[in-house]
């Protein structure tokens, strides 16, 4: 059943991006830097960091829905001819009576003239820890990803555009605010999501809640939820608030001891707050071939659902969407998807080249009396059934583990089933991705007849995407699945493909209109 660490990590990234960012900037009210490449900086706006404080150490409590969940820590320091900016967030979250601690942090090192040198990102969930190091050169970025004792190395292009490092963005944004700017538009690179470029807009709204502060409303292209920040005269954020359907996430400036005390509680139970109860039981979903489900947002926002695999949708004249799930239906693989190497690549989460994963894939196929020349559909189903039986410890206690770790532990919930199946498929040369959304359960976490958050797998079979749920014992899929996002899971850090989940979590009502057996 459901895993929430991935989505909570995106919430963490939101805090990291908004409060202290690696940014590009373009602001019509003040000067705009004109450069030829991402390494050059010039002019008064983007110059060296002279005039900035050489040290800053800020701590925040973090709460969700009024419940303290943990802390956020930011540090800026000048170390000789280098500048280091560190951000870290630690949250403890309830999960159906249990609790999980999620920790994400990044450390960016640059030279005093603004040249990026290295960025290290760490993410920990339970006992699972991953680390990614980005080392910058003039033309590319060398990436080393480590998790579960294995390291994968690759190269990636440098992010395009005018590079502003953390020290520069702190100085420049503060300068524009002091100059009286009422709207600042800039571009940021989020270290926690693979140096993804994010467009951001910050608008002055008036006086803040905290004394002698100004409120700024910040929106960004990565996460569909705005954040309010109360900023003091020195440019420091005193309070930030992100409105979410499951409850506002609030960070408040405090002392280190106060921040660390706030993580002592079990945190808000996000599984409980995000489940959707049905007005009447619908157990027929588990055995049917087709279902039509009406989905509405509770706050009136437009809903975004993909048409992929078994799922299609259309507008509901009464509001929201009609979502149709047909177990026998597939969706054609687009030319872009066909050319996308990520669906066959190894990553920290889906390490299809791990010898243990390769061995499991071969064992699964041979135990079904198949081989590499057997039809793709038959091999895909054999792999799905194998994963269902292979993971014998089916619970919520396992952190978001990669396929390599699951191959050893035989433990996990829906996310571990999904990533292990995706890895086995790729080991057999079958392109795959992870699907995320909601699934019907007759009973879960003490509640009956609910839709709860869930992950499964999609595979390319004969030019089409098919849905495969490795948590099911009697069939490969059923129409009680609502798909919200798919992802290649090609990065050990945060995945922007799941950002749509944030605006949907806790913000929908669901009605089963009819079911066809």
Label each PLM-derived region with a short phrase.
Residues 9-20:
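Bacterial N-terminal signal peptides
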Residues 22-24:
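Sec/Tat signal peptide C-region and signal peptidase I cleavage site
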Residues 26-33, 48-140, 144-158, 168-332, ...:
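Acidic, serine/threonine-rich low-complexity disordered tracts
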Residues 81, 406, 443-445:
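Short Asp/Glu-rich motifs
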Residues 164, 329-412, 420, 479, ...:
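Secondary-structure boundary elements
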Residues 1-11:
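Bacterial N-terminal signal peptides that target proteins for export
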Residues 214, 223, 234-236, 417-505:
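Hydrophobic/aromatic-rich core segments of domains that either
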